[in-house]
């Protein structure tokens, strides 16, 4: 399976830097990168999607066409920008913004019906990891049980919560074992990415694991040169 690199800007990128980054990345890449390189700016960092060399996605959207949803953007807004790719289930939205499994399912089902490409994020906390691998498997299985795993536009990103933003990536053995388990659950055509303190130093090794189909990258992608280096490992 072709390897993938995704940049998640979170809420860290200044607006004009984000716009400049997208334009410069477009100049750097080639058409064959379109399905292999994804960028998720924050809402103000999005631009009308005329990019041909990478896929532009949104970090979040409310599961309605439009309406009285103060502070949200909806499918109509994204469609006006010609954006049809969306992150759902990131741990920061699950924990900080209290998005429940039932709401994540509602989001998934709504945007599945719109034929969006969905990057669905899962991952266990440190307490679960310390209970052992059996507990991890049960936790991750529960996170996946309410969504359609045969949806053809699904990508799953495994991000152990204890490794996000901590500069402590999971060990290669942990990634190998966990991805091996998840591959048994997922449709064989569904890409499975790893995220969690990915950086220029460890990206190549992680991509070398057969069951890792790509990377979802946070802070290491915020500098364009770093992201370009990681793309070169694909």
Curated annotation (Swiss-Prot):
Q: Which domain of life is it from?
A: Bacteria
Name the InterPro entries on file. Aldolase_TIM, TIM_sf, TrioseP_Isoase_bac/euk, Triosephosphate_isomerase, Triosephosphate_isomerase_AS
> A GO CC term?
cytosol
Question: Quick one: where is this thing mainly located?
Answer: cytoplasm
Keywords associated with the record: Cytoplasm, Gluconeogenesis, Glycolysis, Isomerase
Where is the protein found, in the record's own terms? Cytoplasm
Recorded hits in SUPFAM superfamilies, A to Z, give: Triosephosphate isomerase (TIM)
The record places the active site at: 90, 159
Could you say which enzyme class this protein belongs to?
Answer: isomerase
Pfam families with a match to the protein in the record: TIM (PF00121)
The question of whether Cytoplasm is a record keyword is answered with yes
Q: Which Gene3D superfamilies match?
A: Aldolase class I (3.20.20.70)
According to its UniProt record, which reaction does this protein catalyse? D-glyceraldehyde 3-phosphate = dihydroxyacetone phosphate
Pathway assigned to this chain's UniProt record: Carbohydrate biosynthesis; gluconeogenesis; Carbohydrate degradation; glycolysis; D-glyceraldehyde 3-phosphate from glycerone phosphate: step 1/1
GO terms (molecular function) for this protein are: triose-phosphate isomerase activity
Identify the EC number(s).
5.3.1.1
Q: Which GO terms describe its biological process?
A: gluconeogenesis; glyceraldehyde-3-phosphate biosynthetic process; glycerol catabolic process; glycolytic process
UniProt: substrate binding residues:
8-10, 165, 197
PROSITE patterns documented for this protein? TIM_1 (PS00171), TIM_2 (PS51440)
Provide the family line.
Belongs to the triosephosphate isomerase family.
Q: How does it assemble?
A: Homodimer.
Functional note: Involved in the gluconeogenesis. Catalyzes stereospecifically the conversion of dihydroxyacetone phosphate (DHAP) to D-glyceraldehyde-3-phosphate (G3P).
Q: What is this protein called?
A: Triosephosphate isomerase
- Name the species this protein comes from: Helicobacter pylori (strain P12)
């Amino acid at each position: 399976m072709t390897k993938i690199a995704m940049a998640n800007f979170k809420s860290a990128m200044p607006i004009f830097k984000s716009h400049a980054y997208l334009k410069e990345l477009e100049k750097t890449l080639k058409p064959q990168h379109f399905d292999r390189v994804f960028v998720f700016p924050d809402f103000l960092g999005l631009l009308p999607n005329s990019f041909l060399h990478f896929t532009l996605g949104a970090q979040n959207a409310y599961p309605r066409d439009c309406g009285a949803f103060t502070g949200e953007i909806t499918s109509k807004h994204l469609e006006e920008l010609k954006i049809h790719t969306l992150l759902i289930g990131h741990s920061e939205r699950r924990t900080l913004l209290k998005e429940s499994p039932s709401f994540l399912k509602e989001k998934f089902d709504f945007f599945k019906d719109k034929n969006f490409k969905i990057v669905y994020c899962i991952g266990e906390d440190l307490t679960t990891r310390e209970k052992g691998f059996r507990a991890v498997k049960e936790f991750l299985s529960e996170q996946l049980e309410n969504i359609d795993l045969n949806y053809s536009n699904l990508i799953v990103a495994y991000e152990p919560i204890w490794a996000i933003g901590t500069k402590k990536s999971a060990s290669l053995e942990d990634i190998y074992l966990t991805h091996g388990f998840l591959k048994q659950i997922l449709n064989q055509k569904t890409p499975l990415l790893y995220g969690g303190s990915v950086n220029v130093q460890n990206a190549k090794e992680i991509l070398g694991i057969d069951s890792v189909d790509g990377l979802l990258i946070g802070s290491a992608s915020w500098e364009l040169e770093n992201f370009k280096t990681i793309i070169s490992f694909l």
